[in-house]
């Protein structure tokens, strides 16, 4: 009987064999995913560093026979140090995003998965042009990934003098793609990205030479997230071991707890060590696996920790959400809310919600749902997302004044967290987590109450208008009768008296019915009735 042969493969080879795990399941999805990964990197290189983003996206068909497209995304961000570029684009699971703060990316995979997919169907390398802020040179790279070794292959590296003090990054990828099937999703992605980042400007040119430009509407950038220490509720045995190894030298376990974790001070550290039956002065490198396991178990069950710090999070903010919704949908009503920070499994999170109603919004059987996670629009896998579930199944919109069978309603939800519970590495839908689901519903209820108040007031005004119009029908007849009486029946003199009486009676009607809406009042004044 022959024996099985065991081998290992590199992370690069694993994702080359399984591109669908990173969202590259077919030529259409691959094109969308490439644009998305490059735009996310561009935004993280700009707004996180308080730079107003200017992002250019160009897609060109360069080989019609083989369906090879060229994708270029350029930003005005902080740039990439030249010694970092090869690994940033040529080493899978190498990233600046393995930190405890909110980032758009989280796996160190995105752009490398695009490079791997690119290599599978054509021979051109990824091209990177970058210049860090205050750099005197602009650097040019052509790279591929050594799939077996998971290492970058540098095909070309040059630099030129930075005469115009440009800073930022431009990335060009060539890939086998299907523009016609990806077109709608890419346009949707760019539009939805702009909705929550109206402080950015986007230039987009597609393979059909169509150009769209979203202009910057404000200079207000959300407060960027800060890196924080781990919260005790989010630890596990391997994390503790990793943190111990990462320390330059052994330290007493008490000092380790106080200095390496948030929410642990002197008193709390003493309580934890007492419950875990560990001496305060024992060195971290002397801890056995059983002692580390005990320590983690106590930290998980300890009740007196403060909630995780929300400093690691960056919300969009109510003003920017409303601005984005108004600019794209032109509604008659737009409101938003940002909830207070909550936590799940030791990770802080914040839910934001926005609603736009009426105006230019097209009626539809179900609300138009805009889903976001860490400022990323989620386009695919809508029905499997907890946001969709809450909006369409758990919210009774009729309770909030929406009675239409096909309401003109847009519902936006944004979840930001140091760890978004995505259902897969493709980052397209959020899993059902009880704490998050509850906060989404509470956020929607909060903003829906504002919508109900608006709809109620609007209906009152419409009823007032109907009643006033009823009165108006009698004003000409009453005015003419009184005018004739005042001028002694002389129809030649009735004109001025009639106009004066008609205006006075109209004012009485407006005041009596408490019409305070100037627009409505003007509409009523211009209302034409048949004068008897």
From Swiss-Prot:
Keywords: ATP-binding, DNA-binding, Isomerase, Nucleotide-binding, Topoisomerase. HAMAP family: Top6B (MF_00322). The lineage of its organism: Archaea, Thermoproteota, Thermoprotei, Sulfolobales, Sulfolobaceae. Belongs to the TOP6B family. This is Type 2 DNA topoisomerase 6 subunit B. GO terms for molecular function: ATP binding; DNA binding; DNA topoisomerase type II (double strand cut, ATP-hydrolyzing) activity. It is an enzyme of class 5 (isomerase). It comes from the Archaea. Homodimer. Heterotetramer of two Top6A and two Top6B chains. GO terms for biological process: DNA topological change. Relaxes both positive and negative superturns and exhibits a strong decatenase activity. It catalyses: ATP-dependent breakage, passage and rejoining of double-stranded DNA. The keyword Repeat does not apply. CDD domains: TopoIIB_Trans. Its EC number is 5.6.2.2. ATP binds at residues 41, 75, 96-97, 105-112, 427. Pfam families: HATPase_c (PF02518), Topo-VIb_trans (PF09239). NCBIfam families: PRK04184.1, top6b.
């Amino acid at each position: 009987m022959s024996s099985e042969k065991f081998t290992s493969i590199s992370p690069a080879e694993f994702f080359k064999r399984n591109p669908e795990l990173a969202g590259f399941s077919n030529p259409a999805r691959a094109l969308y995913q490439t644009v998305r990964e490059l735009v996310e990197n561009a935004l993280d290189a700009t707004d996180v560093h308080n730079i107003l983003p200017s992002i250019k996206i160009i897609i060109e068909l360069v080989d019609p026979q083989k369906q090879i497209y060229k994708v270029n995304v350029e930003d005005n961000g902080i740039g990439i140090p030249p010694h970092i570029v090869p690994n940033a684009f040529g080493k899978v699971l190498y990233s600046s995003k393995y930190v405890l703060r909110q980032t758009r990316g989280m796996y160190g995979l995105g752009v490398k998965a695009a490079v791997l997919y690119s290599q599978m169907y054509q021979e051109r390398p990824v091209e990177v042009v970058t210049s860090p802020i205050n750099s005197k040179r602009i650097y040019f790279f052509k790279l591929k990934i050594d799939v077996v070794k998971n290492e970058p292959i540098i095909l070309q590296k040059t630099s030129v003098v930075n005469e115009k003090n440009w800073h930022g990054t431009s990335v060009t990828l060539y890939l086998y793609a299907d523009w016609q099937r990806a077109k709608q999703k890419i346009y949707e992605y760019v539009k939805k990205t702009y909705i929550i980042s109206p402080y950015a400007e986007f230039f987009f040119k597609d393979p059909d030479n169509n150009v769209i430009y979203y202009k910057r509407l404000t200079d207000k950038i959300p407060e960027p997230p800060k890196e924080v220490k781990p919260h005790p509720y989010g630890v596990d045995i391997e994390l503790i071991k990793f943190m111990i190894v990462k320390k330059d030298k052994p330290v007493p376990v008490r000092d380790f707890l106080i200095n390496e974790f948030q929410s642990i001070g002197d008193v709390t550290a003493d309580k934890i060590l007492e419950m875990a039956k560990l001496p305060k002065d024992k060195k971290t490198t002397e801890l056995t696996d059983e002692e580390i396991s005990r320590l983690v178990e106590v930290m998980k069950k300890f009740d007196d920790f403060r909630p995780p710090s929300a400093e690691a999070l960056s919300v969009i903010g109510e003003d920017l959400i409303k601005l984005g919704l108004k600019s794209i949908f032109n509604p008659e009503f737009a409101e938003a809310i940002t909830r207070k920070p909550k936590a799940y499994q030791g990770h802080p999170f914040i839910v934001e919600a926005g609603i736009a109603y009426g105006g230019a919004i097209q009626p539809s059987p179900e609300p138009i749902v805009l889903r976001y996670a860490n400022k990323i629009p989620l386009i695919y896998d809508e029905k499997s997302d907890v946001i969709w579930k809450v909006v369409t199944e758990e919210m009774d919109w009729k309770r909030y004044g929406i009675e239409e069978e096909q309401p003109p309603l847009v519902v936006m939800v944004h979840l930001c967290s140091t760890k978004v519970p995505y259902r897969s590495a493709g980052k397209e839908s959020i899993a059902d987590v009880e704490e998050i689901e509850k906060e989404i519903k509470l956020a929607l209820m909060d903003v829906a109450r504002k919508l109900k108040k608006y709809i109620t007031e609007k209906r009152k005004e419409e009823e007032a208008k109907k009643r006033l119009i009823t009165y108006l029908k009698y004003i000409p007849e009453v005015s003419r009768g009184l005018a004739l009486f005042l001028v002694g029946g002389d129809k030649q003199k009735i004109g001025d008296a009639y106009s004066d009486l008609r205006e006075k009676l109209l004012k009485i009607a407006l005041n009596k019915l408490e019409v305070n809406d100037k627009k409505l009042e003007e509409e009523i004044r211009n209302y034409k009735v048949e004068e008897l």
